[in-house]
Amino acid sequence: WERVGFVHGVMNTDNMSILGETIDYGPFGFIDSYDPKFICNSSDSHGRYAFENQPSIGLWNLNALANALVSLISVEELTAILKTYETTFRKKYYELMGAKLGITDVSEADSQFIDRLLLILEAEQIDYTNFFRSICEYRSREENAFLANLFKNRAGFDSWCSDYDDRLRQLNLPREARRSNMLAVNPKYV
């Protein structure tokens, strides 16, 4: 859900299935301009369920499930399982975010590269969905006026694009294949 900017307004333990799927029909939303602190529930004044907090709420919910299973599974085994959450979530999150940029083999350096882009999007208040859909048409730093025009701080985005060009060259993936892959994971509308 984070890949597309979806925000659960209430992500309590009773609103999450044993498979980790959320099943609440209460408040929800999609981030417009990228804001990790976005809250879609007017009663969540402290931001417990803010966009950036949703992964840790998932872990909180899994801890609650583990407490319910302690009579069936040892505390040590449950603890070992829960310790894998952050690494597993982080790996999958960056794979999904990398796919939005056409990056097929995400490395630790890519996660920093993605974080850098998100900081730029946040500072510039760029529409999350539209940006990622638009970047599907990206060719190179020199041919990105359609994207660069969205940014007030063009120098910051231009610097990111220069690094993006380097990363795309490393992939050695034809532009049309990359574009097709990106269109499949970057919705036009949410």
Where on the chain are the PLM-derived regions?
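Phosphate/ATP-binding catalytic cores across multiple sugar-kinase/actin-like superfamilies
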Residues: 1-4, 96
